[in-house]
């Protein structure tokens, strides 16, 4: 006996960053949301920073899926996200002041681990302790993301569902706080965190969160089976993935496409198309190896051009991003671990006016040549990039929406990226504006 569904299931797209984050995922998620009925965050926390420019108005989102800017689209925060209720409501209130309806459209998994004040305190105190001891800082955002994931893996985390049971929450919180205050005061020489303050704030947030709590896994599976197209919105980037990134200079979650299934509660067969977002050059925030890094602080250099014209400052932290040439060997690694279906190249317009462009196709490592990024920060630190030189272009590409309107040199640059990485370019972004996008192949129709 064979079951036959009466409605065709929806098609789903996963959007991931292929570099060290800040690739422009937010704009592309917003653009693709026009063809989807639900947008899902599946990992990370409010350390993410997605900037959208709609009708000239800039909006920065850190926790809520970018689809919130499209009326009628449902937004989901999956179990793979670590949730700061304080930051969530700060973001909700900001959107509501701008006239965006949020609460009736946002569904939050009851299985999300909570980020509480002691997590951020641990994050900040550890970085200070490393610096004082002469150890390199990891470069965390200080938001408590890592410590919250530690509690999850150690099976002691407080989760969103615990907020429904005040007595249970209080008992778990007291035990957890005893542990973390011991570390804060005895090892990191930082102040203790007060139980009553944390508990009272959590109970205030509990009442506000209850209407949005949901079995996100079931809702996503039901919606897709009934024909809804879903968009899974990755945060950070592949080279910040805790397993596949430049460890230990990474975030504390899996940023790769495969985690969209585990972090949202859907089967891997529901991930139909994987779109890798990559800048037309490279950037990185914080410490860690960066083979193609340029001098981005000295005026009248290419690196300075990328930094200033590209407005390369972090959305979440405001820190300057390090800048460098495009790294196709790095992108090969990202394509491999994500199973990319296609690429979207962002910030092509930032390269306007650069006379000569360099593209890294591989590295020299300990006397040998490799055409793919090695595993591990120590090996990557020793990599010497091997460059191809390509002609730049003087014409402006800002706002171009048709591929054949791009300068010939820009087309050649993009074609070479495809050749070296083996991944087709399906979309190109030519400014932060939602409408300044070239579509070569629609992920929802591919």
Curated annotation (Swiss-Prot):
Per UniProt, the cofactor note for this protein states:
Binds 1 Mg(2+) ion per subunit.
Q: Which residues does substrate bind?
A: 315-321
* Binding-site list for GTP: 21-27, 49-51, 321, 347-349, 429-431
Q: Which organism is it from?
A: Polaromonas sp. (strain JS666 / ATCC BAA-500)
Compartment list:
Cytoplasm
What residues make up the catalytic site?
22, 50
* Example GO biological process: IMP metabolic process
To which pathway does this protein belong? Purine metabolism; AMP biosynthesis via de novo pathway; AMP from IMP: step 1/2
Annotated Gene Ontology cellular component terms: cytoplasm
Q: Name the major location.
A: cytoplasm
* Names of the cofactor(s): Mg(2+)
The EC category is: ligase
Keyword match Metal-binding? yes
Recorded protein name is: Adenylosuccinate synthetase
**Record's function text:** Plays an important role in the de novo pathway of purine nucleotide biosynthesis. Catalyzes the first committed step in the biosynthesis of AMP from IMP.
The record's section on SUPFAM superfamilies has: P-loop containing nucleoside triphosphate hydrolases
The answer to keyword RNA-binding applying to this record is no
Listed transmembrane segments: none
Gene that produces this protein = purA
EC code: 6.3.4.4
Gene Ontology MF terms:
adenylosuccinate synthase activity; GTP binding; magnesium ion binding
What Pfam families does this protein's entry cite? Answer: Adenylsucc_synt
Per UniProt, the keywords (alphabetical) are: Cytoplasm, GTP-binding, Ligase, Magnesium, Metal-binding, Nucleotide-binding, Purine biosynthesis
> What NCBIfam families does the annotation carry?
PRK01117.1 (NF002223), purA (TIGR00184)
UniProt catalytic activity: IMP + L-aspartate + GTP = N(6)-(1,2-dicarboxyethyl)-AMP + GDP + phosphate + 2 H(+)
Where along the chain is Mg(2+) bound?
22, 49
Locate the residues binding IMP: 22-25, 47-50, 141, 155, 236, 251, 319
């Amino acid at each position: 006996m064979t079951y036959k569904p009466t409605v065709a299931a929806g098609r789903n797209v996963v959007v991931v960053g292929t570099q060290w984050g800040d690739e422009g995922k937010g704009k592309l998620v917003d653009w693709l949301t026009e063809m989807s009925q639900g947008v899902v965050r599946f990992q990370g926390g409010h350390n993410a920073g997605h900037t959208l420019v709609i009708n000239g108005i800039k909006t920065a989102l850190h926790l809520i899926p970018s689809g919130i800017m499209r009326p009628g689209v449902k937004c989901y925060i999956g179990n793979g996200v670590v949730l700061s209720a304080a930051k969530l409501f700060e973001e909700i209130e900001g959107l509501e002041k701008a006239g965006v309806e949020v609460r009736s459209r946002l569904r939050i998994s009851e299985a999300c681990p909570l980020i509480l004040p002691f997590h951020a305190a641990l994050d900040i105190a550890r970085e200070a302790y490393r610096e004082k001891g002469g150890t390199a800082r990891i470069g965390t955002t200080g938001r408590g993301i890592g410590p919250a994931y530690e509690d999850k893996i150690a099976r002691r985390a407080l989760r969103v569902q615990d907020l429904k049971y005040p007595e249970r929450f209080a008992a778990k919180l007291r035990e957890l706080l005893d542990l973390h205050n011991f570390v804060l005061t005895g090892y990191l020489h930082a102040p203790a965190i007060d139980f009553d303050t944390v508990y009272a704030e959590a109970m205030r947030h509990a009442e506000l969160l209850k209407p949005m709590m949901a079995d996100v896994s079931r809702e996503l599976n039901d919606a897709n089976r009934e024909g809804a197209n879903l968009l899974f919105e990755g945060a950070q980037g592949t080279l910040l993935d805790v397993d596949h990134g430049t460890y230990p200079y990474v975030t504390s979650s899996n940023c790769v496409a495969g985690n969209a299934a585990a972090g949202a509660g859907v089967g891997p067969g529901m991930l139909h198309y994987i779109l890798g977002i990559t800048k037309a050059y490279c950037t990185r925030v914080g410490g860690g190896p960066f083979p193609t890094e340029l001098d981005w602080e000295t005026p009248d250099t290419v690196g300075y051009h990328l930094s200033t014209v590209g407005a390369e400052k972090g959305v979440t932290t405001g820190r300057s991003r390090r800048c460098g040439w495009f790294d196709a060997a790095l992108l090969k690694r990202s394509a491999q671990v994500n199973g990319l279906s296609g690429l979207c190249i962002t910030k092509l317009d930032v390269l306007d006016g650069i006379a000569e462009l360099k593209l890294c196709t591989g590295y020299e490592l300990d006397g040998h040549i490799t055409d793919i990024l090695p595993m591990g920060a120590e090996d990557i630190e020793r990599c010497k990039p091997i460059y191809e030189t390509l002609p730049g272009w003087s014409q402006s590409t800002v706002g171009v929406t048709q591929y054949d309107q791009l300068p010939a040199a820009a087309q050649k640059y993009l074609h070479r990226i495809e050749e070296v990485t083996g991944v087709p370019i399906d979309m190109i972004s030519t400014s932060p504006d939602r409408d300044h996008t070239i579509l070569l192949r629609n992920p929802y129709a591919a």
